[in-house]
Amino acid sequence: RCKESKPGKNGCRGIDDKHWNSQCKTSQTYVRALSKENNKYVG
């Protein structure tokens, strides 16, 4: 996720600031991928 209200060290915050650098677009795509995988496990 890219939250402008609470910018991290690189301007973007996610599950882990170390892995979620300043690439908001990449992080959002990664979140979608994780969400799809989680849906498979849940459903």
Curated annotation (Swiss-Prot):
Keyword terms, alphabetized: Growth factor, Secreted
GO CC terms: axon; dendrite; extracellular space; synaptic vesicle
Highest taxon above the source species: Eukaryota
GO molecular function (one): growth factor activity
PROSITE patterns: NGF_1, NGF_2
Keyword Secreted: yes
A UniProt-annotated Pfam family: NGF
UniProt subcellular location: Secreted
UniProt entry tagged with the keyword Secreted: yes
GO biological process: cell surface receptor protein tyrosine kinase signaling pathway; modulation of chemical synaptic transmission; negative regulation of neuron apoptotic process; nerve development; nerve growth factor signaling pathway; neuron projection morphogenesis
Protein purpose: Seems to promote the survival of visceral and proprioceptive sensory neurons.
Family: Belongs to the NGF-beta family.
Protein name, entry field: Neurotrophin-3
Provenance organism: Raja clavata (Thornback ray)
